[in-house]
């Protein structure tokens, strides 16, 4: 692709973005939700299955949560409009996310929003994924959404009432990196090595070369009132 074609492609995407009240741009909701999960039974080889599991995980937080992260207690109601946990996932599958969400206790609110959602945002959407989504017919605008919502180098701050509770949330995230074999199989490039910081209060997944110099973790945990000077995050939960 020539430089002129690349520039035209960028201009085409920018024209289709919506503009918020403060001038920020975001991918339209219709594009974000305009995906179709790929049936695994269409795959003929283990490599194809792995690619499809990855692709479905990028597209759908509920899929990642139930199929990859093993959240078997989430609602399995096939009527998506009545499936509570599917709808909870859809709530945060949007560009320009700034939501305050109130849900009664014991409905897996922390599981969806403080465990599954942060990991979903930290999935590694790169050139290989871009090429795959293009090859199966997704638009440049949908790929823009994927690039905006997933980043191997993302910095997420998780806040709880106390640091003790925040660390408990962190332990649930770290458990997937340390003990979820299926998650490890699908996304080996983000699994931490001995070089990455991995403590109770800061979890650094393996990053790209350009992201390794960041002081903030992929997932940093704090309690209310903790100092945040000189810290910079992409997402706060």
Name each model-derived stretch:
Residues 2-4, 9-18, 26-237:
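Phosphate/NTP-binding elements of NTP-utilizing enzymes
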């Amino acid at each position: 692709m020539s430089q002129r074609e690349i520039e035209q492609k960028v201009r085409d995407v920018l024209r289709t973005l919506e503009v918020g009240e403060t001038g920020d741009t975001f991918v339209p909701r219709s594009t974000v939700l305009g995906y179709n999960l790929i049936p695994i039974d269409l795959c003929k080889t283990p490599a194809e299955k792995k690619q499809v599991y990855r692709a479905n995980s990028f597209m759908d937080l509920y899929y990642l949560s139930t199929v990859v992260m093993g959240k078997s207690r989430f609602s399995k109601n096939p009527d998506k409009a009545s499936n509570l946990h599917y709808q909870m996932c859809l709530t945060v599958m949007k560009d320009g996310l700034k939501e305050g969400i109130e849900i009664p206790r014991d409905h897996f609110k922390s599981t969806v929003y403080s465990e599954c959602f942060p990991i979903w945002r930290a999935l590694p959407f790169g050139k290989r994924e871009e090429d795959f989504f293009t090859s199966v017919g997704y638009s440049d605008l949908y790929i823009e959404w994927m690039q905006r919502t997933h980043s191997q180098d993302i910095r997420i701050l998780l806040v709880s009432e106390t640091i003790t509770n925040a660390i408990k949330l962190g332990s649930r995230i770290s458990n997937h990196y340390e003990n979820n074999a299926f998650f490890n199989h699908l996304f080996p490039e983000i699994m931490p090595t001995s070089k990455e910081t991995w403590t109770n209060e800061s979890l650094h997944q393996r990053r790209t070369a350009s992201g390794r110099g960041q002081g903030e973790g992929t997932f940093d945990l704090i309690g209310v009132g903790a100092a945040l000077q000189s810290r910079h995050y992409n997402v706060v939960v």
